[in-house]
Amino acid sequence: MKNRLVIIVFMVVTMLCASLALPLEEKEDEKDEKRSLEVAGAVMEGANLGMSVLQTILQAIGDVSRKIAVGVDNESGRSWTAQNAYFRSGTSDVILPHTVPSGKALLYDGQKNRGPVATGVVGVITYTMGDGNTLAVMFSVPYDYNWYSNWWNVKIYHGKVRASQKMYEDLYYYRSPFKGDNGWHERNLGYGLKSKGFMNSSGAALLQIKVMKA
């Protein structure tokens, strides 16, 4: 009888411990999922994209004098598929998120080349949209702020076009780029879409863009 009572008490205690541990495990899983979403190369809910997420990406890059965190929210109503990233200067250790459904945001980063080199981080990323056209995002974080400033641009190209030096020059010199002036800027992109974006003026640059229906 005594042994049976001990077994029953042990089973009750075990069940109570398990019931308490489950919510804790679920909370830890939620924390891990949230942390995993706030890294470059990931896709997250577009509504949750904000400067705090981009700051987390910058911190993960570490102590680099020229770096950028990019977040692009897809509210276009169509899914996007990654094409490529082109860097005129600088680099990234991150692969572009392959698929960005509507309602989601892609996260990406870039940094100057390692070592004592006088370069910034300048490049273009491209995505094929559901209608077959190409969304291009250009960013420029210079090394020398005595001569240059932060700039960014977003444009839709007809058909499938890969990011390249030619595309960079088009977006930087000829397509009315926006200065990284710590302010928001809007533009009609055509094809039934418009954009709204922000870039700061720092060497630790934040670029947040939302592409939505016009």
Curated annotation (Swiss-Prot):
The record marks Y148 as: Important in the initial contact with the lipid membrane. The keyword Transport applies. GO terms for molecular function: channel activity; toxin activity. SUPFAM superfamilies: Cytolysin/lectin. Residues 38-47 are annotated as: Plays an important role in the hemolytic activity. GO terms for cellular component: extracellular region; nematocyst; other organism cell membrane; pore complex. It comes from Anthopleura nigrescens. It is found in: Secreted; Nematocyst; Target cell membrane. A motif (Cell attachment site, crucial for protein stability) lies at residues 179-181. Residues 1-21 form the signal peptide. Phosphocholine binds at S89, V122, S140, P142, Y168, Y172, Y173. This is Nigrelysin. InterPro entries: Actinoporin_PFT (IPR050677), Anemon_actinoporin-like (IPR009104), Cytolysin/lectin (IPR015926). Octamer or nonamer in membranes. Monomer in the soluble state. Pore-forming protein that forms cation-selective hydrophilic pores in cell membranes and causes cytolysis. Pore formation is a multi-step process that involves specific recognition of membrane sphingomyelin (but neither cholesterol nor phosphatidylcholine) using aromatic rich region and adjacent phosphocholine (POC) binding site, firm binding to the membrane (mainly driven by hydrophobic interactions) accompanied by the transfer of the N-terminal region to the lipid-water interface and finally pore formation after oligomerization of monomers. Residues 140-155 are annotated as: Trp-rich region, which is important for the binding to lipid membrane. Residues 46-65 are annotated as: N-terminal region. It comes from the Eukaryota.
